[in-house]
Amino acid sequence: MRKALAYLSQQGLFERKAHVGTRVKARTRTGRFLNEYNDIRGIDHYGNLYPRHIQNVERLVLNEETADRLGLIPGEEVIRFKNIRVASERHPEAVVVTYVCIYPNALEVLDLIKKRSDDLIITLAEEVTGQECVEVKQAFSATTMPKEVSDIFHVPENSPSLRIIRNYYDSRGLSIVASESFHMAERFSFSVRSVKRS
């Protein structure tokens, strides 16, 4: 049943969100992975629709350029890995490529990821570290893909893409998880509606 619901959700026939419910959708899609969302919860839900593969786990001391880009502190040691979401286990075409940074005190997250594939990484990190995420900052930008990312998508280097940098903070303003995601151009859109209050 869960696989059937996940498949229908991937096809855009309805959407399921935790603590929100299920909503039937009627929307024409051009291209297998065109997705449109109008809230932040939807973006996290989007990533969790697809199977993930963890690659290239490494310990890294942040240089100034990387720390500045991710909103972290230069010289800090982090554990970085690739979180690749694919269309399905049968069709392992990449949907999104994400570089995730966690701190050494959250190392156990890497073991939990294998056992709890439906849980978001921030959920696992909260459980392991005892920190509670109270704020998420997201920065969207149009950019080009570095070669190691374009190779995963099987497109030329410097192909256009959407980059999303996310920072998950606790109540003290300390980072729990930071990530940098790449989506292929024209496969993802994010819209915001503002309403004037009287």
Cite the ranges covered by each PLM segment.
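N-terminal helix-turn-helix
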Residues: 1-25
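Short, charge-rich binding segments
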Residues: 14-15, 45, 71-74
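A generic structural motif
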Residues: 18, 28, 58-61
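Short, cationic-aromatic polyanion-contact patches
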Residues: 20-37
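Short secondary-structure boundary/capping segments within folded domains
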Residues: 44-45, 91
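C-terminal all-alpha effector/ligand-binding and dimerization domain
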Residues: 50-198
